Amino acid sequence: MACAVFQIPPWHLDRKYGSCSTILLDNSTASQPDLRHTLERYANRSLAIFEEPVHPLPQEKLPGKSFKHDPKRNCIFRHFCTLFQVIKLTAPCAIVALVYIKRLLTSANIDLCPTNWKKIVLGTMLLASKVWRNHGLWSVDDSQNSKDTAVENMSKMEKCFLELLEFNIHVSASVYAKYYFDLCALANDHDLYFLFSFLHKDKAQKLEGHTSQHSLSLGPCRVGMENYATYSPLSSQPVLGALSLAEVLPQEIKQEIHQVLMDHGVPCHYTCFLLHPEDSTLERFLVLHSIQGLQEDSVLCKVEIHGLSPQPQTYQSHFRSPSLAELLNRISGTCRNHFAGMQK
């Protein structure tokens, strides 16, 4: 037993995980990410566009400054903190800027080097702040971000960024959510985890989300349907959601409900993942299903049917949000028709 314990990484012994009876969350969600957590995750990613020795960001020479070695994560983190404090940016701006940096790598065929990362970060942050605020700002409004950077240079930098991005500055809700969860996964892979606390009622109310419940009395059974969705600041439509039939249904109508989903054009499939009502938490659901295959303004649908079998069946798929109400009506109609036929 002692040998088995020593084989476990020490950081896993210190971590706490959520369970059915205990929910442990940090202060970060996709719609309202925590600033410090986002910057620490973001500090591992930095790209380049301008040569800093040719166009130095500070005019004076800094002692001990080297352009031959990659900057440490703490160095990048301190630079981000200073930049965010001066410009007064929020955590979503960092995620949007990371999207722009990734697009620069693809479209402009540029690479990361220790001499250039500050200029690329500054340019993407300024562009992301203007796009995020959603109104035209003059470069002089953000000129206080660096006392050694002239407004003319900032304007040229912004113009160059837009040209390299091919003016593709739109960030959809699905792309925003994907980068958010990619940052969370990256932090977890590098053992950069944060303190979790118990989910209390006041903390749950602060999470930006919307839940709607529907209850129907259908013959001898009561069918409960719940739609749990979060909203991204980039879109007014639901980004993620869950549809759950959490009450007991007869075994005979499981195939009928599955056929309703197929007729509705929802590509359903059986999955071994079972989300029971007691652990149907927002964070657990998003981490498992939000990264792969998420489309803009789509809803992640999960239908769980409890029948006579010992294990419930679960169906999941992506579909456009306007179809949610229609899907609820179709499933409800199938249940009503089933019980109406039983009474005849």
From Swiss-Prot:
Organism: Homo sapiens
Covalent S-S links between cysteines: none
Alphabetical list of PANTHER family matching this protein: CYCLIN Y, ISOFORM A (PTHR14248)
Gene responsible for this protein: CCNYL3
CDD domains on file: CYCLIN_CCNY_like (cd20540)
Keyword Protein biosynthesis: no
Listed name of the protein: Putative cyclin-Y-like protein 3
An individual GO BP term: regulation of canonical Wnt signaling pathway
Gene Ontology CC annotations of this record: plasma membrane
Domain Cyclin N-terminal residues, every copy: 40-170
